[in-house]
Amino acid sequence: QRQMCIRDRVNPAFFGKKAEKIREDSRSMKILVIDGQGGGVGSQCIAQLKEERETDWEIWAVGSNSMATSAMLKAGADAAATGESAVVYNAQRADVILGPMGIAFAHSMMGEISPAMAAAVSGSEAKKLLIPMMRCHVQVMGVSPAPLSAYIAEAVAQLHKMNDRL
């Protein structure tokens, strides 16, 4: 059985031939994009990932709130869900977790990231590509401030390198 998601209600035909191909292709990289607040960072990541048409990446979106989830669905996520349970469930099934740095810290993003969400992200065996955000009150030494688009482009380049290794 698969988990119900917003896309099921929005477009019931979604889980047709495309989804069957994704499930059959064991080499398909499962990318979990997690975001909160308005979903702006996550939706920009998904839009950039969707431009990479030659890839067979399966892009899942999980928002800490429905507004973030909706924004990521509009950006083109293949499947989406909302809330703590969705983060915990999907973090264990993803190959890569992509999102703002705050998703790995409890009570970040104005309290939207619960301790269980942060533990699921940090405890997952998935490769984590975290985008530094200066609003998180965490500064990573050696990381120079850059525009969000530069960090997203770097994440996409890293995903291509990882995909080549599969």
What are these regions (language model features)?
Residues G36-G39, S64-S66, S85, I103, ...:
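Short, ordered loop/turn segments at secondary-structure junctions
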Residues D56, G123-K128:
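A short helix->loop->beta-strand "cap" motif at the edges of active sites that frequently abuts
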